[in-house]
């Protein structure tokens, strides 16, 4: 597909429609991940994790923070979007099950409304993938030899290309 297609093209609009959910999910996950990694937070979050039965709390807090930051960056730039979506689904399902489910749906009462919204966005990205306007698409184009010819010679299908397509 040429990037010079007209905006009237329905497929182009559908591809562009993946950008806002990727950006929203990514920004949210980066924010929450960095919150778990800032000074003193691993101990605080780790203490909470241990209070709900997750041990070792501090290590899990750091691992969760790192996973959320990487998932957020991946979602925003459209690289490893499906693994990022899986990470979001896992962390949010866990948060829902261990923390928010007992409070009901209403977010103002500590409920799971926000978890469900993030999980729905992640589920959609898991199904759709990163879309045309993504780092993954750019890398794939380069690996297939569809990118700037002066930088790459035409690539033959390779194990690397198959891996790139697999982790889309």
Where do the language-model regions lie?
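Membrane-interface interhelical connector segments
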Residues: 40-56
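Conformational-control "hinges and anchors"
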Residues: 72
């Amino acid at each position: 597909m040429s990037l010079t297609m007209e905006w009237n093209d329905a497929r182009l609009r559908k591809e562009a429609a993946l950008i806002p959910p990727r950006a929203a999910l990514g920004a949210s996950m980066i924010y929450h991940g960095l919150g778990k990694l800032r000074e003193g937070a691993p101990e605080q979050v780790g203490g909470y994790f241990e209070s709900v039965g997750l041990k070792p709390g501090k290590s899990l807090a750091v691992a969760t923070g790192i996973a959320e930051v990487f998932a957020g960056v991946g979602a925003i730039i459209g690289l490893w979007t499906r693994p990022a979506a899986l990470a979001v689904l896992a962390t949010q399902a866990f948060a829902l099950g261990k923390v928010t489910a007992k409070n009901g749906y209403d977010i103002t009462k500590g409920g799971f409304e926000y978890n469900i919204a993030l999980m729905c966005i992640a589920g959609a990205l898991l199904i759709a993938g990163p879309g045309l306007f993504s780092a993954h698409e750019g890398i794939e184009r380069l690996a297939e030899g569809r990118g700037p010819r002066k930088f790459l010679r035409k690539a033959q299908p390779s194990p690397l290309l198959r891996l790139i397509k697999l982790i889309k």
